[in-house]
């Protein structure tokens, strides 16, 4: 990963958040994702970046970015969108899921809101300076910094750049509509195909993610690719892969690109071993047998 600029730390910028309402009991309810956090004054939602201040909800991480880098677009992974081009990638901190196996735990569950204070214009200028064709909202969940992502995407479009989201897809319909109105491509993590997995390992539910996939595919012009991180003994059974890929063909079509990626244990969670190559190859075989035409394997080397 090539660093674009040196990170400097600042206290969080404050920006009014959208998608919330004041309840009769005096709590603010966030309407951004299906969790619907109920937030007391001075407290944060579970994402750790949307904070109540008085009778308003604040997007506390607005304009504070982490990990600014130039990547090949294939690293997102997007194999069928502007292939061979470079993308300027960045994230912030925070996430609306609590995945125990998160590969970017230091960002998604960060205890402090910090980063490099940056404007949408500066991001677009950096992308152009590094001959990137697009900008990617990645590393953490972009829906929790929707306001900054949308504003940045608008500026990027004005400068001739595309906007890319790497996302868990767990969002409510109204913010989803606004968010994807400004995206050109998305890679959505479908973490498993059982509600039990989402509840036990992510603190979430499956159906809203499926709804997002169908929405992107059928109600937008956004290019869609899907990634599933295969965790041994958790979501890699042939029966689950069979059900998942049959659903994909029926609801998203046979041409949706699908990436099966290998899990690697982290310091935070090592309850499963690394994904064996055999599991990835088996998933690919099942997916192709069920009709998916663009199946890729990630985070693994295959001997030629």
Feature annotation, model-predicted:
Residues 31, 93, 97-100, 154, ...:
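Core alpha-helical elements of the protein kinase catalytic domain
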